[in-house]
Each structure stands twice: as structure tokens, then as C-alpha cells.
Design a protein with these regions (language model features):
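C-terminal capping/gating helix-and-loop segments adjacent to ligand/active sites or protein-protein/ligand interfaces
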Residues: 2-13, 62, 145, 358-363, ...
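Mature extracytoplasmic/periplasmic domains
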Residues: 45, 61, 292-296, 314, ...
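Short, well-ordered beta-strand elements
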Residues: 46-57, 76-81, 104, 207
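Extracytoplasmic "Venus flytrap"/periplasmic binding protein-like
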Residues: 68, 72-136, 167-179, 278, ...
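Hinge/lid segment of periplasmic solute-binding proteins
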Residues: 107-160, 200-205, 219, 307-309, ...
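Short, solvent-exposed loop/beta-turn-alpha elements that line the ligand-binding surface or hinge
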Residues: 124-136, 206-217, 228-250, 299-300, ...
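Extracytoplasmic/periplasmic solute-binding protein
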Residues: 151-155, 160, 185-240, 284
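Glycine-centered hinge/linker elements that transmit conformational signals in sensory
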Residues: 187-192, 237-269, 311
């Protein structure tokens, strides 16, 4: 007996049939994109995907990301390749140029001006600019999303701090580390041991400061942050040019005083052992360095009692700190860019997943929620709190910038150039990079 359906009934039956067919196709994996996350995520689970990931981090530290991501994306496997940090950039760039680069890469915080053309930004569907601002500190926003396009997410945020030898401080009856540069200057004579004669050889140093990269690890970063504390912008906001003026001159003079044998604050020489070695061996009471160096220092001297304090400030009411860190980005040539960004956002924007990484890596946090949680942590608290006031500036080539600043310092210490001449030479060389 034929069915006599009205026009409205036919429309309803057709709609029901269409919905049922659509759900069947989704279930079979023919139509990806709308599955529940616990059955493979919005990318589906039918297609097997392998994401290649290159970086400098220890594979064991990254395992929480891989394990947690596979729980929601069982069809995706992440293959990680660890590369020595000294070789990483060259190896990565050569591979990308040859079309053999990874889908996901570790990307340094100051790389964007140099390597922006090699990575693909996230889409609005993956993470919005406003969400990025909510999640991460200002320094990451300025480094990774300068024009509201998000090129990378920070894995951690390390900052330059004051690392001191607790035993030496106790022996000199110094109960607390300096809070500002004035306090630091006053402490210098208490730790100094200077030899007799006109050469004034440094036997024991208060801190590794005033030298070039030849003897001081992160010397360029230390001079950079002192310039920023003195009010330097380091680069013009309109013309993107370096213009060293009064703030930079004052900061440079301040820095160099600690390596001037004729000065009252003389405490360092480029002829001394490298700062990390000098600190590990007790030849200097303090260094200005990052959390990343602490395991190395303890390896050099397992009995070293390291105190961690905030970087001294010119104006403690308006602290300015300096960051050095890595993020994760997706290669411009990746065939799995959507999956790559899905992995990055899930791993780094999720508090529970990011915290598991911190627990094994001991890296300072990048998420604001974790910065708040770790603010009073005995190991990471100083680094976490400084991340909120960390600054940076767009460097066209971080390696060349580092060398230019080091040469500038050394040229004055060796009396090859005056301070003004050295600044002018460095200014010209920096502007040639843009």
C-alpha cells in the first residue's frame, strides 16, 4: 500500500535520513572533523599521521607532551629528533632549504626577525591573539606575536638572575643578596681580593660582570638588560634602527666600571677563567645567568651551594628583566601544519600538560597560571616572577648581535677604541643587519 505523505512529511523524513547518513559517515571516518575528543579528536582517527619534531630538549622531558597528545589523537604519532644545540640552527636551516625539515621545531625567542619566513602562523581557529595574551607573559607576545599573528608558543621562559655562592656569602657575613645595583656596588669591596702592583690582578672576584663574551657567559644579555633598565629602547619603534644615545652611554659606562683596574668597583678581567668555571671553582662569588646553567654548574661542582636571587634593578619599583627561552613552531613547508599546531596548542596551552613538563625538566614556566602557581617555589620562584617583567627587542640575527656587543666591550677593555667610538661602531654594525 503506497504511502501518501504530505510535502512537509517528505521533508522531515528526508532530513532524518540525511542526519543518520551523516552520522554513519562520521563514525566510519569518511567525514573527519566532528568526532568527540576521546575518540580521536576533531581531526578524526581514520588517517594515520606522523609528525616529525626537531629540537634541542631532552627527549625524556618532552614525553608528557607525546603521551598526553596520543590519548586524544590516537591516530597521530610524534617522532622527536634531539639535536645538539650548537649544531641545531645550521642543521635545521639546511634541512628546511632542502625540503627535508620537520613539521614541528623548537624556535628560539629571538629568532622571528631572522626566520619568520620559515614558519607558518597559527590560524584563529587554533588560538586567537587575545587568548595568547591571556595565557603567556608580555615578552612572549612581543617575541612571537608582534603583529597579532602567532608564530610560536613558548615552551618555557628563562630569565637572567643573580646566582651566588651561599658559602662565600656566609663567610663574608653577607646575609642577603643585593636587591638593586647600588647594593651590589657596595658589596663589591667585601668580596674582592686584588693583587698588589700596578696591574691589580683579580685573585677573588665579587661577580663576573664587565667583561666580554670571551670571559663572561651571557655578557651581551647582561649589558642589554642594563641598557633597558637605563631607559633604552635599543631599537626605534618607527624606523627599526639602532640609535645609541645617552641611556646606552650611561649603561655602557656602568657596565665597564667593573672591569676598570683604575676604578673603585673593579672586580673582573677578561683574563680571568670563564665565568661559569670561575663560579664553580669559587673564584667569583656570583654570576648573572639563567636557570639553564644551574645543572651544568652542579655537574662541575656537586658541592656548590647556589643561591638564586632577583636580578639587581636600577629602579626596583619598575623592574626590567631579560628573557632567553625556546618555543614551538610549525614549519612553513609542513604537510601536516594543522596537526602540528594542534599538538603545540594542546601541549603548551593546557596547564596540566605543561606542568608535567615542568616537573621533569625543571624549566621555569611560561603559562601565566603556572607562573602564579610557582611564584614562591624555592627552585623556580625567582625565574617565574621575573618572567612577568622580562623584556626583549627584535634582533635581526641573534648570533651576530651577540658578537657585536662582545666586540664593543672588548674594544674598550683593550683600549682599541674609546667608549663613544665603540658604541658608534656597534651602532653602525647593528644597523647593517636590518
Amino acid at each position: 500500500m503506497p504511502l501518501n505523505l504530505s510535502r512537509n512529511q517528505i521533508i522531515i523524513v528526508s532530513a532524518i535520513f540525511g542526519v543518520v547518513l551523516f552520522l554513519v559517515l562520521v563514525f566510519l571516518g569518511v567525514i573527519p572533523g566532528l568526532k568527540e575528543q576521546n575518540s580521536g579528536g576533531f581531526f578524526g582517527q581514520g588517517e594515520q599521521i606522523v609528525l616529525s619534531f626537531w629540537g634541542v630538549e631532552n627527549n625524556d622531558f618532552l614525553m608528557p607532551f607525546f603521551e598526553n597528545y596520543q590519548k586524544i589523537r590516537p591516530n597521530v604519532r610524534v617522532d622527536y629528533k634531539q639535536i645538539n644545540e650548537n649544531d641545531y640552527e645550521k642543521t635545521l636551516i639546511n634541512a628546511l632549504a632542502a625540503g627535508r625539515g620537520p613539521d614541528i621545531m623548537m624556535f628560539r625567542g629571538n629568532w622571528l626577525p631572522k626566520h619568520a619566513d620559515k614558519i607558518i602562523p597559527a590560524s584563529e581557529n587554533q588560538i586567537t591573539f587575545s587568548r595568547f595574551q591571556e595565557l603567556f607573559p608580555t615578552v612572549a607576545v612581543s617575541d612571537f606575536a608582534p603583529e597579532r599573528k602567532i608564530y610560536a608558543l613558548p615552551l618555557f621562559v628563562d630569565t637572567l638572575t643573580f646566582l651566588y655562592n651561599k658559602n662565600i656569602f656566609d663567610a663574608k657575613s653577607v646575609a642577603l643578596p643585593p636587591k638593586n645595583w647600588n647594593d651590589f656596588q657596595n658589596l663589591v669591596p667585601r668580596f674582592n681580593e686584588i693583587g698588589p702592583g700596578p696591574n691589580r690582578q683579580v685573585i677573588k672576584s665579587a661577580a663576573a660582570i664587565g667583561g666580554s663574551e670571551k670571559s663572561v657567559h651571557a655578557a651581551g644579555d647582561l649589558l642589554n638588560v642594563i641598557m633597558l633598565q637605563f631607559g633604552s629602547q635599543l631599537i626605534g619603534q618607527k624606523n627599526r634602527q639602532i640609535n645609541f644615545g645617552e641611556p646606552e652611554e650611561k649603561a655602557f659606562d656602568f657596565y665597564l666600571q667593573f672591569a676598570n683596574p683604575a676604578g673603585q668597583r673593579y672586580t673582573w678581567s677578561d683574563n680571568l677563567p670563564y665565568s661559569l668555571n670561575a663560579f664553580a671553582e669559587g673564584q667569583t662569588a656570583a654570576i648573572f645567568d639563567y636557570a639553564a646553567q644551574i645543572p651544568l654548574l652542579k655537574k662541575k661542582n656537586p658541592f656548590l651551594e647556589i643561591g638564586v636571587s632577583f636580578l639587581p634593578q636600577l629602579n626596583p619599583e619598575k623592574p626590567v628583566n631579560f628573557a632567553d627561552y625556546w618555543g614551538l613552531a610549525v614549519s612553513e613547508g609542513s604537510k601536516n601544519a594543522a596537526y602540528g599546531w594542534d599538538f603545540i596548542v594542546y601541549s603548551l596551552a593546557d596547564q596540566k600538560t605543561a606542568e608535567k613538563y615542568l616537573e621533569v625538566s625543571k624549566r621555569p614556566p611560561a603559562l601565566r597560571t603556572l607562573i602564579q602557581k610557582f611564584a614562591n617555589d624555592p627552585d623556580l620562584g625567582v625565574f617565574a616572577r621575573q618572567a612577568l617583567t622580562a623584556r626583549s627587542w627584535p634582533q635581526p640575527d641573534n648570533n651576530k648581535v651577540k658578537q657585536i656587543f662582545s666586540n664593543m666591550i672588548e674594544s674598550v677593555l683593550t683600549a682599541k677604541l674609546s667608549r663613544r667610538e665603540a658604541l658608534q661602531k656597534a651602532e653602525n654594525e647593528l644597523n647593517e643587519l636590518y
